[in-house]
Amino acid sequence: MPTVLKAAAVLDVDKGRVVPDGFVLVAGETIQSWGNRTDLPSVPPDTAVLSFPRQTLIPGLINSHAHLCVPSGGQPFYLKQSDEMALLTAVRNMRRELLSGVTTVRDCGDQNGVLFALRKAVNLAILDGPRFILCGPPLTMTGGHAHFLGGVADGPAEIARMVRRRIAEGADFIKLIGTGGGTPDTHPAHASYSRQELAAAVSAAHRLDVPVTVHCRGTPGIVNALEAGVDQIEHA
């Protein structure tokens, strides 16, 4: 059964304008039409109608760099938590994202792959949630930034194997840690993975048409990432 959403206005992001007296017509998971209510097509008499007389309807927002497993409230994210707590934290944060208008989340590093299960639960309609773009635990060197998340790999051969494993688990992209970060005993200005190690990851991922992004907060790591041919750099 279709549903009509009526609101004070609808945001037209293509033309950069606000359409007054707006509507959005939805059938299942598809937006069939939208615009000013004078353009509302004929619908069956039993069509559900939801009214938002003071609100403006906007397209779903995209959070392009999230960490749903990270606790909030001032708790340092590097304090090791169980996978069960990481998953429960992600469920809470996922709900907050959805209620704030975010309908797509690109998560840039979870703990031991718990978000793969969460995405499956959402896809099976067990839970309400956004669309997910996932990488699983980021790959990092022994003792490197975010090492506690479960993605430690050293040397080109081991890194390439880990890349293939991540993709088999369901990763949409590969994330590597190219410099230190907020983890104790790491330094944001210091490179972690070498250019050769990053290049091994890029080669393995690109062979399977999967993009690669790298956490870099210092120039040496950025240079390594660029020379290795990565697709994206986070934080630079």
Task: Annotate each predicted stretch with a short phrase.
Residues Q75-L88, G144-R161, H190, P211-T213:
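Active-site mouth loops of central-metabolism enzymes
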Residues A7, H65-C69, H215, H235:
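Histidine-centered divalent metal-coordination motifs
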Residues P2-V4, V10, D14-I58:
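Histidine-rich, glycine-flanked metal-binding segment
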Residues A117-K120, E158-R161, R165, Q196-S203, ...:
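Alpha-helical scaffolding segments of alpha/beta enzyme cores, especially the outer helices
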Residues G60-P76, P130-G151, L198-A199:
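N-terminal small/glycine-rich loop or linker at the start of catalytic domains
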Residues T89-L115, G129-T140, A171-P184, P211, ...:
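Divalent metal-dependent hydrolysis catalytic cores, especially in the metallo-beta-lactamase
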Residues P184-A236:
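Active-site core of metal-dependent hydrolases
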Residues Q55-L124, Q196, G221, A228:
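Metal-associated gating/positioning segment near the N- to mid-region
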